Regions:
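Conserved adenylate-forming
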Residues: 67-72, 193-206, 211-254
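Conserved AMP-binding/adenylate-forming core of the ANL superfamily
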Residues: 22-23, 32, 42-85, 89-93, ...
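Conserved G/P- and acidic residue-centered "switch" motifs that form tight phosphate/ATP-binding loops
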Residues: 78, 99, 216-217
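Surface-exposed loop/turn positions
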Residues: 42, 76, 100, 206-207, ...
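Flexible, non-catalytic linker and terminal segments flanking ANL/adenylate-forming cores
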Residues: 1-24
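Alpha-helix-centered segments that form part of catalytic cores
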Residues: 24, 28, 172-205
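Structural core segment of the AMP-binding/adenylate-forming
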Residues: 69-70, 97-188
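Conserved short alpha-helical elements in the N-terminal third of ANL/AMP-binding
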Residues: 94-98, 250-251
């Protein structure tokens, strides 16, 4: 006899706790723990180009120095407008390392919408996809870092993008854009940097970590600030809710 969905749900009652532990560290601690426990495990897979947790942490620490040398300090806001790419991951955790606030922007949002969001959070440094850089003018921001999202692809794919054929040009134009004078290459800056000093203070769990922007379905998108503890609790909720996860052995597909 087929059991009802309610009867099946009863089997799960003991699997998910009624209370979830509240984290006592910053979000950077999550990455640092993963790099310490699983240094050689693959953290990112981007079109077949893989990066281990240890390599990602090294990139994050280099990027943290780049931001700090650009004038970003604890409590400052950094605008990030990137699609899913390794640089987006690194930029976010670089902010988390130095206690900056990562303001996540839709890279396809119109310039008028971005102007309002920049005005609300007051960030003076932006890390943006080349295709949307025009929405982040230097007369509003002190520093604009541009990101080539093809940079993290395997060398063979980047070589194909440079072929003088129509299909390669079309794909290249979808991925890359014209970079205005006065901007800086995020990829070159982070590659030539050195890791930030280990003595640089970590943020506290109650410091602001992220500003997320709502969809604006009912009007102008709102800016929602969240602390390290807010996001950390959400991470713990996901870990306990998806209760059959095996630590260090799962793969997540991001769209």
């Amino acid at each position: 006899m087929t059991r009802s969905i309610v009867e099946q749900a009863h089997d799960m009652y003991d699997a998910v706790p009624y209370e979830v532990p509240v984290p006592g560290e910053s979000l950077y601690g999550l990455l640092d723990d993963a790099a310490r426990l699983y240094p050689d495990r693959i953290a990112l897979d981007y079109f077949g180009a893989t990066t281990t947790y240890a390599q990602v942490r090294d990139q994050v620490l280099r990027a943290a120095r780049v931001l700090h040398e650009a004038g970003v300090g604890p409590g400052d806001t950094v605008a990030i407008a990137l699609p899913n790419c390794p640089q987006a991951f690194v930029a976010f955790y670089a902010c988390m390392r130095i206690g900056a606030i990562a303001a996540q922007h839709n890279p396809l949002a119109p310039a008028s919408e971005i102007a309002g969001q920049l005005g609300r959070h007051g960030g003076k440094v932006a890390i943006v996809w080349e295709k949307c850089v025009d929405a982040y003018p230097l007369d509003v921001l002190d520093t604009v870092f541009t990101v080539d999202i093809s940079h993290g692809m395997p060398a063979s794919q980047r070589l194909l993008l440079r072929l003088p054929v129509a299909r390669a040009r079309q794909t290249r134009n979808q991925l890359r854009g014209t970079v205005p004078a006065g901007t800086r290459s995020w990829d070159r800056a982070t590659a030539s940097s050195t890791p930030i000093d280990p003595s640089f203070p970590l943020p506290s769990p109650d410091d602001l970590a992220v500003i997320l922007h709502t969809s604006g379905t009912n009007g102008i998108p709102k800016s929602a600030p969240l602390t390290h503890r807010n996001i950390g609790v959400n991470v713990n909720q996901c870990m306990f809710w998806v209760w059959k996860l095996h630590e260090g052995a799962e793969t997540f597909f991001s769209l």
